[in-house]
Amino acid sequence: MKEKALSIVILAAGKGTRMYSDLPKVLHKIAGKPMVKHVIDTVKSIHAKNIHLVYGHGGEVMQTRLQDEPVNWVLQAEQLGTGHAMQQAAPFFADDENILMLYGDGPLITAETLQTLIAAKPEHGIALLTVVLDDPTGYGRIVRENGNVVAIVEQKDANAEQLKIQEINTGLLVADGKSLKKWLSQLTNNNAQGEYYITDVIALANQDGCQVVAVQASDFMEVEGVNNRQQLARLERYYQRKQADNLLLAGVALADPERFDLRGELSHGKDVEIDVNVIIEGKVSLGHRVKIGAGCVLKNCQIGDDVEIKPYSVLEEAIVGQAAQIGPFSRLRPGTALADNTHIGNFVEIKKAHIGTGSKVNHLSYVGDAEVGMQCNIGAGVITCNYDGANKFKTIIGDNVFVGSDVQLVAPVTIETGATIGAGTTVTKDVACDELVISRVPQRHIQGWQRPTKQTKK
């Protein structure tokens, strides 16, 4: 039998009142990415035909933040329950496809669990995702007869026997489009809250003689939703520890897996060592034997073999060659490219600059919009003056150039191979090969000088 097409509905219209935030709840982040984006990425990996995103509160913000996502935006103008949300999406359902309902505030659901749920769906019935809890207090209980689900009973409506049930409803379900549209049209809001509940389709399916089965998730955290910042923080730490464990199993040496954050994708070689409180963002690749010191932040970087990044350095969109030494307290900004065996020291900032093989910028310097050749020494306090208040200009430094301390290189300027710039010089004109350039205020010696003294108050 031909496999049915799959469409996804992600419910994301809630206000998230308990977050105490102007930001829509589903846009709050786990591992640097909005919760709903985690869900979207997961369903994209299972090749859904359509992704319907039901939105309401903060719709303009959501559409702006998620403008590149391949979703069909479905407005739920009034939040009248989960069933009502699904009713808004129902006109887009095809009769001959499966419809999988998810929640935008459940970011940790995995593709494997969803595929298991879809595979379990009866031909014209419903498959629910459930989980067994030691303490199910507060959750809707799954009531079964002969293995099939006949009802979901909320805590307040459960009798003594039903309260003993430990299997609870996660809210995730899959059904075929034709049947689901029928059941959604039959929902009523005849309840204390005056809302339309998706759970009522279970009774409607049973009335039609359709089978309702339940698939149990192995890990409650996978289906945990977020209603407040405490829950958000709990999911963040769980997810980070899970990522850290995966890296440990892959051979990365983490000094403390509880104090490591991965907010993107990390690829790595062998014998990588990462100290505490390191943050990885975006796409980062680490070569073999890379060492990262405590408190470093790397975002969208490529790091070569045998590089050492010393504590509290910040690297963003940088490419670092083999055996480079960086830090402590260095900053590499976007557009930085360090060749092999370069040294970037403490309180040095590099921006949109190429530093050649073996060159050193070791202390208290700013190098921006520049090309630095091989085997150069850039002394302490050197500044490339690249901005005139309106435009940026480039500094070009050839090979084997020595730049002394406290030098200002006023761009645009070129310093050719082998030149030497004396300490305290302000360079405003090009320097030829092997020249020595010095520009200083003449030194004066004043004999008998006395320091001023403080005047006493009368």
From Swiss-Prot:
Region span, Linker: 230-250
GO MF terms, alphabetically ordered: glucosamine-1-phosphate N-acetyltransferase activity; magnesium ion binding; UDP-N-acetylglucosamine diphosphorylase activity
Matches recorded under CDD domains: GT2_GlmU_N_bac (cd02540), LbH_GlmU_C (cd03353)
EC number: 2.7.7.23, 2.3.1.157
Localization terms from the record: Cytoplasm
Catalytic residues of the enzyme: H363
Region (N-acetyltransferase): 251-458
Pathway annotation from the record: Nucleotide-sugar biosynthesis; UDP-N-acetyl-alpha-D-glucosamine biosynthesis; N-acetyl-alpha-D-glucosamine 1-phosphate from alpha-D-glucosamine 6-phosphate (route II): step 2/2; Nucleotide-sugar biosynthesis; UDP-N-acetyl-alpha-D-glucosamine biosynthesis; UDP-N-acetyl-alpha-D-glucosamine from N-acetyl-alpha-D-glucosamine 1-phosphate: step 1/1; Bacterial outer membrane biogenesis; LPS lipid A biosynthesis
GO cellular component: cytoplasm; membrane
Coiled coil ranges: none
InterPro entries: Bifunctional_GlmU, GlmU-like, GlmU_C_LbH, Hexapep, Hexapep_transf_CS, MobA-like_NTP_Trfase, Nucleotide-diphossugar_trans, Trimer_LpxA-like_sf
Co-factor binding comment: Binds 1 Mg(2+) ion per subunit.
Any single GO BP term: lipid A biosynthetic process
Binding site for acetyl-CoA: A380, N386, Y387, S405, A423, R440
Residues binding UDP-N-acetyl-alpha-D-glucosamine, per UniProt: 11-14, 25, 76, 81-82, 103-105, 140, 154, 169, 227, 333, 351, 366, 377
Function: Catalyzes the last two sequential reactions in the de novo biosynthetic pathway for UDP-N-acetylglucosamine (UDP-GlcNAc). The C-terminal domain catalyzes the transfer of acetyl group from acetyl coenzyme A to glucosamine-1-phosphate (GlcN-1-P) to produce N-acetylglucosamine-1-phosphate (GlcNAc-1-P), which is converted into UDP-GlcNAc by the transfer of uridine 5-monophosphate (from uridine 5-triphosphate), a reaction catalyzed by the N-terminal domain.
UniProt name for this protein: Bifunctional protein GlmU
Organism: Pasteurella multocida (strain Pm70)
Gene assigned in the entry: glmU
